[in-house]
Amino acid sequence: MSTRPRKLRITQSLLSAWEWSFKTDNGYEDFLCTLRREKKPPTKAMLDGIQFENVLNNVLNGEIIPTDHEWFSVISEMSEELKGSQQQVTLFKGVEVGGQEILLHGVLDYLREGHIWDCKYSKTYHLNKYLNSPQTAMYLRLVEEAKDFTYI
């Protein structure tokens, strides 16, 4: 009886950590922490991003955002674009790379009619900041019928 090798589960976070490991002095250690799924306290930027996405999701689910809210303008604009989309869509897809079975695992922020959106919260805007992110290619592989992918 032969034993079949386990599929390796790969997330966009792991791919991004691997890519990051080549860019900084302690990038490899950061990658190992991600690989070991070590919990780290969230940074202020991470907490702000989570709060922003929660407010956006609440508005998409019918909540009214007060006009004096600091994010009123951008949340109103984004919620109009994302209206009718599925939120937090978890997907898995098996692929084979070099004879090794791999399970791609992604959680798409928003999906509607072949369009994927990923919400990125930042205090500063840099055009094409995520253009070469491994997340783009991976999510387009997860949703092969997707026509495009937008970071918002």
Where are these regions (language model features)?
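Mg2+/Mn2+-dependent nuclease catalytic core
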Residues: V89-I152
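Metal-dependent nuclease catalytic cores that hydrolyze phosphodiester bonds in DNA/RNA
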Residues: M1-L108
